[in-house]
């Protein structure tokens, strides 16, 4: 059975960069055994944090060859439903985490993250490291 795709959350990229590790190299290792995905929210959150234009261009080059999860009307409806259901149970998460989680669910991906909110989203598997 093939390994599930992985969608790295912004917290993975940012924590790796702060620790002076290259998140793109880590994801390239994962890509040897599974698909690596990105969504628009992650691109925007991470891209805005990159100060160096050369580094931003390098990230764009990597993201452009990853599986892109589109955010169409169905995804927004699923995100709204997820947030509504979580709110009713007293579980409040950010809109951006809900979108990323719904993107991961859409493609059957595991979320690579350091954010505990993803564990609250039904149907989302979240890990803080990959066993490569």
Map each language-model feature to its residues.
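A general structural signal for well-ordered alpha-helical segments in protein cores
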Residues: 24, 43, 56-59, 76-79, ...
